[in-house]
């Protein structure tokens, strides 16, 4: 019984030692004061990728036109790329039609991204025309920067090749490269 009492007393002393810090008193023995409270962990706010530029080139050996969307600090993870009919060239938020030159169109959507700064100023071109150094891309035009969704439309000289051939998107750290087949 004495052994159990001694162990439980040691356990209490150990627990109290972890919870309190002994501070010498001015007049006499030590006094016990509570340890400083630990502040709650502040959650880390994710940084929104911001579109900072757009460039285009032709890769003859791969038979594709490349449209590169440059972001800071990193490219967004969620990107969709697909051919769409002219009837789907609509402005995000308002639903108004967006005029884009071309015979067929690619819609590029970046989720959890922005194309503006804190004051609402555009951080990337909203319209690239004419697009030089490509064989198929005619125009790259903004379709919206609304509630964390950035949309661009790419107008093409050639008709869409059919459902078996689709444009692709590749992440390269700070960029998303959209590859559009040419003939």
Kindly label every feature range from the protein language model.
Residues 1-27:
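Secretory targeting and sorting signals
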Residues 24-183:
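Short linear recognition/processing motifs and adjacent strand/loop elements at protein termini
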């Amino acid at each position: 019984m004495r052994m159990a009492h001694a162990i439980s007393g040691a356990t209490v002393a150990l627990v109290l030692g972890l919870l309190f810090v002994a501070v010498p008193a001015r007049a006499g023995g030590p006094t016990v004061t509570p340890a400083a409270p630990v502040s709650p962990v502040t959650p880390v706010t994710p940084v929104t990728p911001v579109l900072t530029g757009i460039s285009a080139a032709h890769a003859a050996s791969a038979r594709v036109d490349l449209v590169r969307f440059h972001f800071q600090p990193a490219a967004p993870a969620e990107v969709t790329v697909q051919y769409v009919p002219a009837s789907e060239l609509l402005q995000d938020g308002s639903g108004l039609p967006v005029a884009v030159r071309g015979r067929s169109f690619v819609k590029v959507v970046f989720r959890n991204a922005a194309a503006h700064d804190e004051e609402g100023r555009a951080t990337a071109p909203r319209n690239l025309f004419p697009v030089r150094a490509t064989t198929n891309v005619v125009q790259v035009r903004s379709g919206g920067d609304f509630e964390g969704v950035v949309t661009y439309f790419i107008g093409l000289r050639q008709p869409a090749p059919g459902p078996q051939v689709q444009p692709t998107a590749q992440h390269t750290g700070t960029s998303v490269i959209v590859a559009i087949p040419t003939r």
